[in-house]
Amino acid sequence: YDKSLGGGILNDAGCYPINASRMLFDSEPRGVFCNLTIDKETQVDTKATLLMDFNDNIKSQFSVGYDLDYQSNYGLWGSDGSLSLTRSYNIPPDMPARLNIKNSNIDEEILIEPVNHFQLMVESFCNEIMKPNSCIYNFEEDLLNQAKIMEACRISDKEKRYVETREIE
């Protein structure tokens, strides 16, 4: 690992569940608490544990690490049941994803047909260039909001405290 290259687990893998939480809850977090494990030799963050606090008492928490078994799973738990998705990222284009839905009456697994998600991302990006504002996302606003949360994570780890996203300009 090389700190001068700007990597680290927060940038390399933590960005995905941060973005997914924002998408799933269709809102921005009010604040974060982040704990990074820094490699003593390289000074690069190799593990991250993060709690994001959204409105309406909604929370998102996750852990990522270079030396952890690869899982890439999501779980959502609510008062009426739960959803879980296996192999959410970096899924081979021929592998189906599995969505599990559970509550007191249902225990169902839905196979999601394989798709090349990298191809879909590139196509969406190219389509936005060719036909501006054709995508449901405002890419510029989304990137700025994501950067704000990532910065709040870094400050939270450095200062060992909960950081409200409104603190970040």
State where each predicted segment sits.
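Soluble or luminal CAZymes and related metallo-dependent hydrolases
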Residues: 13, 117, 145
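A short glycine-threonine-serine/GTX helix/turn-capping micro-motif
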Residues: 4-11, 108-116
